Each structure stands twice: as structure tokens, then as C-alpha cells.
């Protein structure tokens, strides 16, 4: 009975968090997560390049429209994300990993926000 309850709870958590219920909820390591999952991944690691649309050196966040435009710089990192059971992982490609429970996510934005340059019209 407890196993059934926990299974149902897990499915509900995936729906609330916007994670798919595909085969075990797994996602192989990728730098291009499914479009429907960007809201989840980009909330907890907003400096990933796949979260931004850049043109002519100015970038707009694909998910959070209230984010200011930024200048494309070292703030944006090439991330790979993966999910195995309830473990969500961000890899920044330089040996830095951020691992968290998918159902209890913890943002990992602070170290990168120090490098973010907000676009000002005078920057042109």
C-alpha cells in the first residue's frame, strides 16, 4: 500500500514540476533538453546557454520574460542536464556538477550572477 502511495506521489510531483512521466522519468545527458522542460531546468540554473536566445551579442531569456536583456558574455555556460530517477544533474563541462533531488530543487544561480552584464542602451 505504501509503495502504491509513493508511486502516485511521484507521478504527481513530476506533473507539478513540469517533468515528463516518460520511461522512468529519465533524461540522458543533453545540452538541449526538451522544450517542455525548459521552465524547470532554466529556473534552477538560469546561466545555461539553452535558456537564452542571443542575437548580435544581446540575449533574451526564453522562459522568464521578466529577466532583463543581457550582454552575451562568460555568464552563459554550456550546460548538460540529466535526470535519473529523482536525481537531476547540471554539468557545466569544467568538472563542476550540481546535483539535486528533482522533487526538491535548489537553485544554483548565485555563482554565475556575479558575471552577468545587463544590457543598457548605452552599450551599443
Curated annotation (Swiss-Prot):
Causes the redistribution of lumenal ER protein to an enlarged ERGIC compartment. Induction: Expressed in the early phase of the viral replicative cycle. Residues 1-18 form the signal peptide. Pfam families: v110. The keyword Signal applies. Keywords: Early protein, Glycoprotein, Signal, Virion. A motif (Prevents secretion from ER) lies at residues 121-124. Coiled coil: none annotated. Belongs to the asfivirus MGF 110 family. It is found in: Virion; Host endoplasmic reticulum-Golgi intermediate compartment. Glycans are attached at residue 64. It comes from African swine fever virus (isolate Tick/South Africa/Pretoriuskop Pr4/1996) (ASFV). This is Protein MGF 110-4L. GO terms for cellular component: host cell endoplasmic reticulum-Golgi intermediate compartment; virion component. It comes from the Viruses. InterPro entries: ASFV_fam_110. The keyword Ion transport does not apply. Its main location: virion.
